[in-house]
Amino acid sequence: MMIRGHKLKIAEGDIPIAGVKSSRIYSDVSPFRKASDLMIHWNEFVFKVMPEDIAGDGFRLASIPVIPSSEVQAVLRKRESTNYVHWGALSISIDALFRKNAGVSGWCYVYDNRWETFEQAMLQKFRFNLDSGSATLVTSPNFPVSLDDPGLSNSISVAVMFENLNFKLESYPISVRVGNMCRFFDSFLSCVKNKVDSNFLLEAANADPLGAGAFGFEQDDQVSELFNYIQTVPTQAIKSREHEVPRGLFGMMGKKKVKSFEFASGSRNLGRRKPQRGRPLERSASLRVAPGFRSQDERVEHQGLSTDSDFENFLRKGKGKAGTESITSEGSSFDNISAREFQFARQDQKAKDGGSAEPPIKSGRRSESVPGRRRQTPSWKDRGNSGTDTGGHLREHSDTGDLGTNRVPGRAGGGEIHGGSEGGGVIQSEGGSRFDQNIQDYIFGPEYKQHDLPPSV
């Protein structure tokens, strides 16, 4: 349940999380106590995203970590008895590195990847518009996580998708900033003001929170199926720095320190090599590692790029032979696919092997389209509902014109989600054959079945 909390003004400048006052979250904050003594930390992660890291239509999901292991180790060195971290506030900022009113928009998910079901995992869902140059959402997750939890880096995950982002390769069109205010503690944190609610909205600018129904998902959909194949962007650490933000009037209350970690996409060093379906890019170890970060799988320091060919190789080898090479984002494994999907994949493997050739790649642009049609993105599809293409489905069901008074889409009937209702108007069930075809399209991509696309595409 999303609850609007204290209203605040989004900070001007380049650090939105700095505008979140710790006194709005914790009751024991006072001018006479330093934030460092209270173990309160502000961090910001800046990612420059290239078109290569965004699927053909601009639909690309990227899992973004929010806490470096080096930060945790520094806290443990200072106080060995520390056991938990409390997520006090989170800011998501998507900045356009191009002219205003260019018609670029998108969606953002904030979720806890440790959950099994979609409705329990989802923290925030919002649609953003970059016509004004930037979009920001500030929220309070308001829950603690054990520092020993192997899913610590997955407890807050951010996935971003873009629409109508028609940039040439080797340019940086988007900057994504993820800021967080967290507090480390030993055994029990009793000073949290809001003790009964998690995930309440603090402020939004050019971002409209949406109900789960707007994305065509159901409460019992499996997160392992919906997000297991989120393709992560390999990043390179550029630099880290520490900002000092004045507190109080004229800085009379001291300065707030905000650590900033800046990253760039590892794709920028790949030259003009363009990823093609069925041909994974070979990335050096330096491009796959972000120093200071640790994924859920301890053997992988940072997630690499998940390609469709990896999935196809897994299908050829079989589930029992996938091995460690199938590890993808944040410790996920291809072994987690459902038995239903695996059955469909195996049945259609022969048809795929005898299918049509790969489409040509245009100069300066990646092409995954069907001639004469608007390009559809096969990189990720909703596998929890029948007859659903994520690219077209999100465009169809995320209409901000159908928002209620609290900016949540209103639906007739169904359960209440975030103050709004969702019903049958969102998900349109279709026949089994349509479902089979969409499973095939998800697994192998429409270029393998260019003349056998479902009518909805």
From Swiss-Prot:
GO molecular function: serine-type endopeptidase activity
Example GO BP: symbiont-mediated suppression of host innate immune response
Segments of skewed composition (Basic and acidic residues): 448-457
General function of this protein: Suppressor of viral-induced RNA silencing.
Protein name: Putative movement protein
Record-stated family: Belongs to the tobamoviruses movement protein family.
Taxonomic lineage of the native organism: Viruses, Riboviria, Orthornavirae, Kitrinoviricota, Alsuviricetes
Gly residues compositional bias, start-end: 411-426
Pfam family, one: MP
Organism the protein comes from: Apple chlorotic leaf spot virus (isolate apple)
Region of interest: Disordered: 265-284, 293-312, 345-457
Keywords noted in UniProt: Host-virus interaction, Inhibition of host innate immune response by virus, Suppressor of RNA silencing, Transport, Viral immunoevasion, Viral movement protein
Domain of life: Viruses
